[in-house]
Amino acid sequence: MKDYLVKALAFDGEVRAYSVRTTNTVSEAQRRHDTWRTASAALGRSLTAGTMMGAMLKGDQKLTIKVEGNGPIGPILVDAHANGDVRGYVTNPHVDFEGTEQGKLRVYQAVGTEGFVTVIKDIGMREPFIGQSPIVSGELGEDFTYYFAVSEQTPSSVGVGVLVNGDDSILAAGGFILQIMPGAQEETISFIEERLQKIPPVSTLIEQGLSPEELLYAVLGEDKVKVLETMDVQFNCTCSRERIESVLISLGKTELEQVREEEEETEVHCHFCNERYKFSKEDITNLIENL
């Protein structure tokens, strides 16, 4: 099954809902970054939340999420675009902890329970929108829920999950975001709160083969949900050799000549996708000649 996202309304417009399958997306991130189990879960949950938050934007708008906890994983960075493209990385991918007796990965130990979630939105204005909230649990779903309440004043519920196999490969990943619209009835809010208490973990529902639509039906009830739009989502980095060449050219002739003198081979590393671009002395000379 391919990865895709669903935008929906529920309860006659009282609730805005997003749901996504990100199994392939998180698998690609795990493959590129060689993340261990707990690191995969942390990165995967962040990529999943970022994908849905990106889908709230329009056109060529994009956002960056930075999760900076006090755990050994270090900062997590995610870039997400309105078109469904997402990329991201963890600073230390080789972090893993023994799971609980129920097999649940201890993501909070990797992320840490103190720190901040920062969201930077590039929505075409002169200055980007920057929102920040403290980490409340380190499990990430709760942390993004709190972010929406504090920074965007939108009562929300964020559920994100990643199931990781013993060989570090990704078995299932996905999630949902529910947002209560102004004027929603108390009965609606109470109904959703009760349903959220009863449903299994998100990753379990996805492992069972539930599509993004069926995930929303499981949470809200099929008769309550009106699907508005679906869109494909994927891990996709914006880096390229041409872009790296442009960055090198921007250094100027003097600095490029110094690079050519000091390095037999110049390597530029993209943290987001772990791609490495190599430039020989001859490559650098060609760049200098084009200045």
Curated annotation (Swiss-Prot):
A cellular component annotation (GO) from this entry: cytoplasm
Primary localisation category: cytoplasm
Subcellular location: Cytoplasm
PTM section of the record: Under oxidizing conditions two disulfide bonds are formed involving the reactive cysteines. Under reducing conditions zinc is bound to the reactive cysteines and the protein is inactive.
Disulfide-bonded cysteines: 237-239, 270-273
Keyword annotations of the record: Chaperone, Cytoplasm, Disulfide bond, Redox-active center, Zinc
Pfam (any one): HSP33
One MF annotation (Gene Ontology) recorded for this entry: protein folding chaperone
Domain of life: Bacteria
GO biological process, one term: protein refolding
Protein role: Redox regulated molecular chaperone. Protects both thermally unfolding and oxidatively damaged proteins from irreversible aggregation. Plays an important role in the bacterial defense system toward oxidative stress.
Family statement drawn from the similarity comment of this UniProt entry: Belongs to the HSP33 family.
This protein's name: 33 kDa chaperonin
Gene name of this polypeptide: hslO
